[in-house]
Amino acid sequence: MATLTETISKADKHDEKLTDFQYSKKIFNGVHEVEDDKQRTDFTTVRFGDVEKKFAVPKDYKYKNVLPTFPNAVYNLTGELAFEDKGLLADPKFSNLLKDVTKVEHLARDLGTVLYGIQLSKLNDAQKNELARYIAERGVVYFPDQEQTLEEFQELGQYYGHSHKHGSNSRPFEDKFAEFQVVYSDRFSPYDQHAKNNSLRYWHSDVSFEKQPSAQTFFKALTVPEQGGDTLFISGYAAYEALSTPLKKYLEGLTVVHSGKEQSEYHRRSGQHVRLDGDTNAHPIVRTHPVTGWKSLFISPGFTRYIPGIPRGESDAILDYLYQHIANLSQSTVRIKWTSNGVAAWDNRIVIHRATYDHLPQTRHLVRIAAQGEVPFFDANSHERSEDLRE
């Protein structure tokens, strides 16, 4: 078991009143530049094995054991994993899940809900099953003020199936939390200029390039900025339904190639250890959800590359159109404003998401756990969500 050692920097007293925004000088050539460390007291240097790194957190930071690292582990591709969707066991009226809810706040008509009064660590199996179905219908659900340890958060994610381990993104150093993906940034973090200049590229469904992309996904906020750092979600159900009938029919016969190679190479160029290279797989453009039976547009701009079987120019034109199409679905887009100890649960198969990249140099720290879902499929007998809602 690795141990953590830390030292705290000492600063000159006359510089102690610098704010984070004063400390952040400028953004230049994609790098978020910072002043000399001697001006600051509010950071800790943490050692993970032979690697030492600065973090803009206090010396007694509660979540030091889940700060981001790239340990020298090696992951291997596995065969197809069994997946039984817990939503298939759920009461479709959500009689167990909603009985203790004190307030239901829908963020949009068909996407996004905030549930108040529930503690995720107290859910029984019937409630967990209904949560799987609830996010299969609502896309993303937010739970504020969760009194939940990291171990309890991990147990919740593990309930839904084999927990995904990311091959290249940061994870905790300790193997006990190897299933967590760590999302962390602060004033020491590189700033990707593409986040401002090429926003469509940042919409994505997590690990859509894998043979079995993530299904039920849980994201826990540990430290949140005062402003910014929100997450936006778009409904794949709504994206499909907003297409013209001829285009729907055309797309239902096509697949699209998703690739994680570029993500792996980005980490490698950044000097970070890659545990498993991103895979490449073709998935249906129109996907059927196994619980709801609803059709969803399964496009992930961060990872989709081309449509096989048609000319590349035609493929590029179709994908460019679909990217613009989903980005313009303002009525089917919601924003999650993170609060400390809040948890978001979403169905990664039927929403895409992106961060807003507007919080730096403030610290943003979250951890994610997700179940690996089924191999994506299209069922010609599936139907649109709106058909059920009209009944």
Swiss-Prot record:
It comes from Schizosaccharomyces pombe (strain 972 / ATCC 24843). One of its GO terms (cellular component) is cytoplasm. Its cofactor is Fe(2+). It comes from the Eukaryota. The keyword Chloroplast does not apply. 2-oxoglutarate binds at T231, W338, R364, R368. This is Putative alpha-ketoglutarate-dependent sulfonate dioxygenase. Acts as an alpha-ketoglutarate-dependent dioxygenase active on sulfonates. Its EC number is 1.14.11.-. The keyword Iron applies.
